[in-house]
Amino acid sequence: MENLTNISIELNQQFNTKEEAIRFCGEKLVEAGCVEPAYIEAMIERDQLLSVYMGNFIAIPHGTEEAKKLVKKSGICVVQVPEGVNFGTEEDEKIATVLFGIAGVGEEHLQLVQQIALYCSDMDNVVQLADALSKEEITENLAIA
């Protein structure tokens, strides 16, 4: 996977709601200097417009089109959630065990989403990320993508 110079990896996280999970991803992007704090609200708004759940136990929280002006540099936050977090409803659960919070300058945003979606379309890759015991293991798995 290309363009992973600004990457934050968080292992063994737990969230009660998808909003809490999205905010966590956004905060990591802010801490990395990738986005302005207002980008976090745009990530919540984006999920309300169209779910950021992608299937295969993966969610890709990211901001709205209008929030691109809040992106300082491209970055990604990989968050492992062993117990999962529901991005669906009680009736139609959509459990994510790996989150990819992303911010992309210009068209890099779309490229990041496409790269992650392609990589995670293989369940073996998702399992490796979900079961990784170290940040280095996740970095290695993503580097070969």
Swiss-Prot record:
Modified residues (Phosphohistidine): 62
One BP annotation, GO: phosphoenolpyruvate-dependent sugar phosphotransferase system
InterPro entries on file: PTrfase/Anion_transptr, PTS_EIIA_type-2_dom, Sugar_PTS
Domain of life: Bacteria
Domain PTS EIIA type-2 as annotated: residue spans: 2-145
Keywords assigned: Cytoplasm, Kinase, Phosphoprotein, Phosphotransferase system, Sugar transport, Transferase, Transport
Pfam families cross-referenced by the UniProt entry: PTS_EIIA_2 (PF00359)
Signal peptide: none
Gene Ontology cellular component list: cytoplasm; plasma membrane
Compartment(s) where it occurs, according to its Swiss-Prot or TrEMBL record: Cytoplasm
Residues the record marks as active site: 62 (tele-phosphohistidine intermediate)
UniProt keyword Transport present: yes
Cysteine pairs bridged by disulfides in the record: none
Entry remark concerning the domains of this protein: The PTS EIIA type-2 domain is phosphorylated by phospho-HPr on a histidyl residue. Then, it transfers the phosphoryl group to the PTS EIIB type-2 domain.
Function: The phosphoenolpyruvate-dependent sugar phosphotransferase system (sugar PTS), a major carbohydrate active transport system, catalyzes the phosphorylation of incoming sugar substrates concomitantly with their translocation across the cell membrane. The enzyme II CmtAB PTS system is involved in D-mannitol transport.
The protein, known as: Mannitol-specific phosphotransferase enzyme IIA component
Organism the protein comes from: Enterococcus faecalis (strain ATCC 700802 / V583)
